[in-house]
Amino acid sequence: MWKEFKKFAMRGNVIDLAVAVVLGAAFTAIVNSLVNDIFMPLLGIIIGGIDFSSLKASILGVDVLYGNFIQQIVSFFLIAIALFLIVKVINRLQREKEVEEAAIPTPTKEEQLLTEIRDLLKDRSL
């Protein structure tokens, strides 16, 4: 059983998944910082510094924290926008790389043969 587990754990896709989870956690910190440290203060300036999280209603002596719910919705949309922008930049960089790779024309069969003939003739003349 130990050998089977070891074989399973050492397979490439399990290790790839573990790396993805760790990178995802690190990326979460980046996105949260972008939202909390950049977007939220800017949004606060736009909406006049309103903090939704303190809004609540008392119903039969129970506090309903609907403001926190609103705050989480705003955070969700800001995180979604941040992720969209990050993915858009990454996609643009990948497209630019693909364009660069596509810009290098691959020689046709004729060009390859002519190059080989040229190289052979050059070697004979030496």
Swiss-Prot record:
Family under the similarity heading: Belongs to the MscL family.
Keywords per UniProt: Cell membrane, Ion channel, Ion transport, Membrane, Transmembrane, Transmembrane helix, Transport
Domain of life from the UniProt record: Bacteria
Record membrane topology: Multi-pass membrane protein
One GO molecular-function entry: mechanosensitive monoatomic ion channel activity
Signal peptide extent: none
High-level lineage: Bacteria, Bacillati, Bacillota, Bacilli, Bacillales
Transmembrane parts of this sequence: 8-28, 70-90
Function: Channel that opens in response to stretch forces in the membrane lipid bilayer. May participate in the regulation of osmotic pressure changes within the cell.
Protein name: Large-conductance mechanosensitive channel
Location within or outside the cell: Cell membrane
Gene Ontology CC entries for this record: plasma membrane
Subunit organization: Homopentamer.
